[in-house]
Regions:
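Polytopic transmembrane helical bundles with strong interfacial aromatic enrichment
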Residues: 1-348
Length: 348
């Protein structure tokens, strides 16, 4: 049966599953369910998710050191518990074993070189690390820094899978056109892409910090168009008195800086291709990332402007905002990875 499973296809499936795990993590956050399973890897001492409020209370009485950060009387709905339970199930029961299986399959394929083996080992190390960070996030009651670390580790793991897929496709001679990078243009753009990708990731972290810090979401006000967005409390450049509570302002400044860099990159690579340089793959990826980023700015604005005195924000917009931000980073990081692989191939 294992002979029928191909590394390239399994790796592609793992990339999709990882993106779903990240999305489920976002669902956990928007439903405020990060502490709905206060222990790890079990959930209120069981492997189930259908736990009544009475059963939750009994567990807290037996574990007085594990009181919820929202107060001793706080209880969770079955749906909230299910979101965290499903997130753990998909990551630990589905994703983890398949990553190990992929590692074994890589070593059975004679056509695959040392880079593929290295990438598969990195993926295994990162999935183990991600499990440890997940435990830490639970232990720290979803502190903002632990949530950002958990998200960053997930993106690093997904990037290792993309690296594995690209290297496998190259070794098998099955690279599609969209994954074929011109080494001349790659040499010019690799460092630029590294800096832009890093800036995009840092901006993503700042957004995660805002969304998990009490009061930060409303720090620019809830007075609607212009006053709350694009301005902040009616000011274009408000003074910073509290770096934590006003982290949304800093996040917005970072967003503007990255978007300017992306627009500049899109223009420069368009000019270079127009002057006879090949490399349409790189151009499409940079343009795609720029387009995603622009759309995501609109999603972020819609989230801020969605405030309602009764229902608060439309939290599903926050989830879309997270996923588009993650996708933008992954597109840019894939462009950097592809450029690096193309340069290594030319140098070998």
């Amino acid at each position: 049966m294992l002979d029928r499973i191909q590394v390239k296809q399994l790796t592609g499936a793992l990339i999709v599953v990882t993106f779903l795990v990240i999305a489920l993590g976002g669902v956990v956050r928007i439903y405020d369910a990060g502490e709905s399973c206060p222990d790890w890897p079990t959930c209120f001492g069981t492997w189930d998710f259908d736990i009544s409020e009475a059963e939750q209370g009994a567990w807290y009485e037996a574990n007085p050191d594990e009181i919820d950060s929202r107060g001793a009387g706080h209880r969770y709905t079955t749906f909230q518990i299910f979101t965290e339970w499903a997130h753990r199930l998909l990551a630990g029961v589905v994703l983890g074993p398949l990553v190990l299986l992929n590692w074994l399959l890589v070593r059975r394929e004679e056509e695959l070189g040392s880079e593929v083996k290295l990438a598969s080992s990195v993926a295994v190390a990162l999935i183990v690390w991600q499990g440890a960070v997940g435990w830490l996030t639970v232990r720290m009651d979803n502190e903002h820094w632990s949530v950002a670390l958990h998200l960053g580790s997930a993106l690093a793991f997904m990037l290792s899978l993309i690296w594995l897929w690209l290297a496998t496709a190259r070794d098998l001679g099955e690279q599609p056109e969209w994954a074929t990078f011109d080494p001349v243009l790659a040499a010019r753009w690799r460092n630029r892409l590294a800096w832009i990708s890093a800036a995009t990731l840092f901006t993503l972290f700042s957004g995660a910090f805002v969304s998990t810090t009490a009061g930060a979401n409303t720090s620019c006000g809830v007075n609607g168009l212009y006053d709350s967005w694009p301005l902040c409390q009616g000011e274009f450049l408000p003074s910073i008195h509290d770096w934590v509570m006003q982290s949304q302002v800093i996040h917005r400044w970072l967003v503007v800086a990255v978007e300017v860099a992306l627009l500049a990159a899109s223009y420069i690579i368009w000019k270079e291709i127009g002057e006879g340089q090949s490399g349409s793959t790189l151009c499409k990826l940079i343009w795609g990332a720029t387009g995603l980023y622009l759309v995501n700015i609109g999603i972020g604005a819609s989230y801020i402007l969605s405030w309602d005195m009764t229902d608060g924000y439309l939290e599903y917009l926050s989830l879309v905002h997270l996923m588009l931000a993650s996708l933008t980073f992954l597109v840019l990081a894939t462009a950097w990875l592809g450029s690096t692989i193309a340069l290594n191939e030319r140098g070998s």
